[in-house]
Each structure stands twice: as structure tokens, then as C-alpha cells.
Amino acid sequence: MIGWGDVYKVVGAMAPLYFALGLGYGSVRWWRFFTAEQCAAINTMVVYFSMPFFTFDFVVRTDPFAMNYRVIAADAVSKAIAIAAMAAWARTRCGCAAAKAGAQSWSITGFSLAALNNTLVVGVPLLDAMYGRWAQDLVVQIAVVQSMVWFPLLLMAFELRKAWVVGGGGGVGPAVMSSSSPPEKQSDVEMNGAVVAAPGGGGGVRLPFWATARTVGLKLARNPNVYASVLGVVWACIAYRWHLSLPGIVTGSLQVMSRTGTGMSMFSMGLFMGQQERVIACGAGLTALGMALRFVAGPLATLVGAAALGLRGDVLHLAIIQAALPQSIASFVFAKEYGLHADVLSTAVIFGTLISLPILIAYYAVLGFV
């Protein structure tokens, strides 16, 4: 049962996130410490340094031989349902190539909103209070799989979109932004629905499949977030199989960078907020859609996946509640780096985290009667 002390622990875990967010927001909006280019550089630092070290340090601490693979499989089924639903929606979109490209881009954002959650900062203390230590261990295992499987797949989707929709290379090529877009939102492609095709062309250059696959594969191979996950899994298997441990100097070097992951991600989000005209940058309609995907569609997909795998009782309840945890911070960081609906993801993280506690407690109360 959840007591006031447990609520305080969860709030205490969430409050530092908003402290870092506020510092980032004030640094741009009030104190004018950073230019737009410097803000982009800070986010790039988070993507290529803070997040990979955070992922590696987190993954190597988890015993891969002690995982509950039934729960992991149920989570995978729920995410596969989200992917299938987004892909089916994108295929039903009619119109020109630019409109279809916009639908494909929105399907990536929709998957992020429905499937990628903040399992550590909010999930660990809350689920420990609800169900005990075993629930904490399970949610950590889900977080590890999210870091080493689903985030690399998200990065692959971003790279494929960049190659196929935007036109490959280092930026927007034949697919150009609408001239009515405000300067500070030029990087957020399809903010009003679609990429605008260049005169005389379609929705962007469609590269040959194998050339695209090679380009995307090379980019992913060079992405520190991908090989941080792979190296983390490899070392975890070796370490827990033969009871080895990293030297203290190596562990200290990793942790001095990994501890910046969450804080700098929220700071970068604050910088992004400070550059927008409104705190809720994407508007009420998209905010409501994001909340529906996060707190309704995600848990429903997990219910289907968990039922298909035969989960029952408290384990089923845990799977549903962890799917209703607030939006993953890393999903915003990657969206900002790739210029895809960062305003939608930032609003989902900020507003969703604020309202998540009463929603999660409501889920806990309702599931208690099932």
C-alpha cells in the first residue's frame, strides 16, 4: 500500500529533474547565457557523451542471466503492437509523397509517445512502494532492454527517415521546410503536418535500398549510443558469468560521465523550452494526443501483450503500470538531435511527468480490484 512517505520519495526523485529544467530555461529566457547554436551543441554533447556513458553504466549493472524473460517478452509484444499500429496508420494516409512522408515521421513520434517511458526516475521508487523489491527489479530489467534494444531501433528509424524522407546527407535536401515556419522551429520537420516537396520533385529523394541500408548501418555503427548498449550487454554477460568486475579507476571514469545523463538531458530540454514562444510549445491538441498515447494507448497495448504471454496477478498489474510511466527523457534528446517534433516530446516529458503521479496511483487503485 502506498503511504505519504512513499509519495514523498517519488516526488523527491522527480523534483531534481525540474531543477535542472528550470536552470536550462532560465539560462536562455532570462539570463541569455547561450545562443541557439550553443544550445544545439549542448544537446549534441548529451547525445554523444552523457547518454552513451549513462546507458553503458546502467546496462553493466544488470545480471542478464536473472531476467524475467516472460515479462520482457510481454513488453516486446506491446511495443511491436505500437509499431504495427503506427505503421498501419501511416500506410492509410493518402495524398502526395510529401503527405506520406509526414505520416511516416509522425509514426516515429507516435511510437515514442506510446512505448518509451521513464522507468528509472519515477518507476523504480513508485513500483517499489506499490509492490516491493521484486517489482523494482523487474522495472529495472525492462529499462535495460529499452536502452539496449528499443532506443537503438528508434535511432535506426531516425536515420532511415533522414535518408528516405529528408533526402540523406547532413540536412534537408530536396525536401524543404515551409517558408512560413518560424526560425526557431526550422529543425522540427513536419510541425504542421508534412514536408513540403521541392518544385518539380516528390517528397524527397528516394535512395536505392542497399545504398540507404549501407548508409544507415554505417551511421548506426558510429553512434556511441548503439555500441554503448552492445558493449554493456557483452560485458554484463562476461562479468556475471565469470564473476568479474571492472577496475575501480574504470568504474569511476564511467560514472563521472554517466551521472550527467539525466541532469544534462533535462537541462537541454530547458534550453529548448527557453527558445520557444510558449512553455507548452506544441499546443493543446497535440498535448492531449501525446497524453492519450502515453497514459492510455501504451497501457492498453501492454495489457494485450501481457495477456498474450499469460501474465497474471501482480505481475500483470506491474506491467500495465510501468507502461503508464511518464515519457522517456532520452526520447526528447534524440528527437531534438534529429529535428523531429522535439516540441511534442518536450511537452510530453514536462507535462506528463507532472500529472503522472495521480494517474499512476489511480491505475494502482483500479487494478487492485481486478
UniProtKB/Swiss-Prot annotation:
Coiled-coil parts of chain: none
GO molecular function: auxin efflux transmembrane transporter activity; identical protein binding; protein homodimerization activity
InterPro entries (alphabetical): Auxin_eff_plant, Auxin_Efflux_Carrier, Mem_transp_PIN-like
Main location: membrane
One GO-annotated biological process of the protein: auxin polar transport
Keyword Membrane: yes
Cell membrane is among the record's keywords: no
Pfam families: Mem_trans
Topology within the bilayer: Multi-pass membrane protein
UniProt superkingdom: Eukaryota
Family that this chain belongs to: Belongs to the auxin efflux carrier (TC 2.A.69.1) family.
Function of the protein: May act as a component of the auxin efflux carrier.
PANTHER family linked: AUXIN EFFLUX CARRIER COMPONENT 1B-RELATED, AUXIN EFFLUX CARRIER COMPONENT 5C-RELATED
NCBIfam families the record matches: 2a69
Protein known as: Probable auxin efflux carrier component 5c
Source species of the chain: Oryza sativa subsp. japonica (Rice)
